[in-house]
Every structure is written in C-alpha cells, then in structure tokens.
C-alpha cells in the first residue's frame, strides 16, 4: 500500500534514537522514549488560502524533522509504523 498525503499533511517515519548514552550506558527498549525525530517520506500539495490559492509546504521529501512525541496519527504500512501529520505539527527541520 502506498499513501499520498492530502492538503498540508506530511508522512513521516520515526528515526530510532540512540540506544546508548554518551557515557556508554545501554538503554533497554522498554525504557526508551518514542523518538521525536523523523524523515519526511511524502508531502501533500499544500494548503489553500482563503482566496483559493495553493501555498506549497516548506518541508520536502528526505528532510529530517522534529515533532512532538504524541504528534500525528500512527498508521502501519507494509509493516512500517508511519505518522501522518499536518506541517504545523512539525517544530523544525534538522540541518545537516
């Protein structure tokens, strides 16, 4: 199955967080928090203004983004857990 986001929605795949701290302590899966970073897999066409004009999204496929731990709607596609969320739910793009 393939998803195509509508309007100002984006599809994000969570990026796993580090399982070891800087001091070398291993964090078990049960204690690890949900990652709050992800990679944008797909973007919608944009948001309509009151005049009907289409405003393109500022994020693009491949961007690494920050979002709230409980943001978006979780969906499973081909065994992968993905998030569908509005661009407004994203906090920032991580620059490389």
From Swiss-Prot:
The keyword Chaperone applies. GO terms for cellular component: cytoplasm. One of its GO terms (molecular function) is protein folding chaperone. It is found in: Cytoplasm. The keyword Plastid does not apply. One of its GO terms (biological process) is chaperone cofactor-dependent protein refolding. InterPro entries: Chaperonin_GroES, Chaperonin_GroES_sf, Chaprnonin_Cpn10_CS, GroES-like_sf. It comes from the Bacteria. Gene3D superfamilies: GroES chaperonin. Keywords: Chaperone, Cytoplasm. Coiled coil: none annotated. Belongs to the GroES chaperonin family. Heptamer of 7 subunits arranged in a ring. Interacts with the chaperonin GroEL. Together with the chaperonin GroEL, plays an essential role in assisting protein folding. The GroEL-GroES system forms a nano-cage that allows encapsulation of the non-native substrate proteins and provides a physical environment optimized to promote and accelerate protein folding. GroES binds to the apical surface of the GroEL ring, thereby capping the opening of the GroEL channel. This is Co-chaperonin GroES. The lineage of its organism: Bacteria, Pseudomonadati, Pseudomonadota, Betaproteobacteria, Burkholderiales. The gene is groES.
